[in-house]
Amino acid sequence: DIVITSNGGYPLDQNMYQTVKGLSSGEACVNDGGVIIIASSCVDGHGGEFFYHLLADYENVEEAYKNICDVDPSKTEFDQWEAQVLLRILVKAKVIVVSEDCDPKLFTDMHMMHANTLSEALNMARSIVGNKKITIIPDGIAVIVK
């Protein structure tokens, strides 16, 4: 299936770190192997070097997730929790970020996909999962999905 959401606009969509909050509602709705599309400007980039490198420094999502989950709870680092949430989402589903304001390489470095438009993102999602059910969450950061 496909979930489409947003982070509610600026300042909540200013960077990828903040965007994870909106992705969480999509995670609650998407089936394993599905696609979450999130519209988020990310005009300020990733939101923190440490956060970025917790994903970008690994070959794949599974390796990054295992590494972060293996950290002793008494030794966790600042921003680790948000990277762990994003990695948990990426283990479950593909993520496509719709943004015209950020270098697409930032998203691909962090194991996500990029689209310039919602139409482009939908075409990408359909090429991954087919013509599946679409769930729309207009303001993903402001809902609790059950």
Locations of the language-model features?
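Glycine-rich phosphate/diphosphate-binding loops and the adjacent beta-loop-alpha structural elements
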Residues: 1-18
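C-terminal non-catalytic interaction/assembly regions of soluble proteins
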Residues: 19-146
